[in-house]
Structures are given as C-alpha cells and as structure tokens.
C-alpha cells in the first residue's frame, strides 16, 4: 500500500531512541522528510547520521519541558519548513513507590510528558487547521487507561495525553486534520532493556530467563505474551499519519498486544 507520504515533513519529538527513532526511520522509508529531536545536540547529530541513508533528516535539539527552549525550538522547526505531521513522542517513566514521589518529580512528569505536547500542538494545530491539512499523533500508553501502581505519575500523564488528543480532535470537526493518540503496551526499547537488566539482577536471575518469565508473572492478560517491537508501534503511527487513515480521528489506538481486557 502506498501511504502517500512522499514529500511530507514530519516532526517527531523525543526521537533519538526507542519508538520515536523507529517511527522516524519508518517515515523516511515511506518517502517523508523527518525532523528528529532530543535534548542534546550530540544525540540529535548521531541520529541524523544513523538515519540519513534512508532519506532527508533534519534535527533540532531542545528540552521541550522548558518554555523558552520550546519556543526557540518551534522557531527553528518553522525555518526548516511547514510541518505536515506532528508526532508528540517525548516522555519518560520511572518505577517508584507512590509515597516516595516528590512534588518536584510530579511537576517534571507533567512538564515532560504533557506540556511538551501542549507546546508543540498549540503552535502547529492552528496552522494545520488554516491550511485544512495535517496530522497530530500523541504517543500515550496503555497505562493511560490501565494505570500502573508502580508508575502512577507516568500513568496520570498518559491519561492526560489521551484527553488532550480527544479535545484537540474536537477542534478539527469538518476539516481534513486529524488528531489521535497511540497507546503502546510493553515495548522493547533501550530504556526498557536497561530497566529489565537491572530488575533481573535485583531478582538474582539472568536477563534472558527473567524476560521470558516476565509476561507470565506480571502481564498475564497480554495476548501476545511478548514485548512489541518499536517497529511494530511505528507501523501504527505511520499508518495513522497517512491519507489511508483519513477517517480515523479522535481515537486512542491501542498497540498493546491485547493487554487491556475490555472491548
């Protein structure tokens, strides 16, 4: 299927690793040009170098949890070109007891996981509506509808992203602009690999055995009983950004291997 993404310009926040980087590669393979983003210029430059063989890659480093850096970032993006597709992927998580999470940490979760998407969307959604064309995808999580007791702040922010997406989608009524959220489940990324290695060590098990048993013990409702790959999630992101998904708007698209036991 030709997704008709050639010559589209895609901005993906938090795209120097994990799902964001996989999505950047997938968009490039479909013929789109991509702007990658990370906090550090060196990681942005490295990502550009790694992906440049697949197509046209631009980069803009910024910490989007900070208002001033986000504003400068948006100016730089506008200098690169007119965005057709915005993927708000920036986010982080930490496993921590609820009672131990400080006010400062709660604020950090909100600034990184929610306000980064608000800042970019607040600028680019009106521009998309003005030209009657565009896609916004907010990368949430299955934790947004099935909150995780060991990651309550993270879960809260992902619920907020789902609500943000639906609210913005209501603003697109009758236009050719769509806004959707994507809800990955357990996905194998660099960050997850690091966490699992640490958890296996703490449990006194080798990593391979620990990972093999993880779904049986911790995620028994998963229907695929494995981690999704970042590429599998990226495939859904790219499809929703295409004209082939023009009738899909305001949804929270699950890519969680059936882990949520509801219709």
Swiss-Prot record:
SUPFAM superfamilies: NAD(P)-binding Rossmann-fold domains
Native source organism of the sequence: Bacillus subtilis (strain 168)
GO molecular function, one term: oxidoreductase activity
Record-given protein name: Uncharacterized oxidoreductase YvrD
PANTHER family hit by this protein: 3-OXOACYL-(ACYL-CARRIER-PROTEIN) REDUCTASE (PTHR42879)
Cited Pfam families: adh_short (PF00106)
Signal sequence, renumbered to the chain: none
Residues bound to NADP(+): 13-20
Similarity section: Belongs to the short-chain dehydrogenases/reductases (SDR) family.
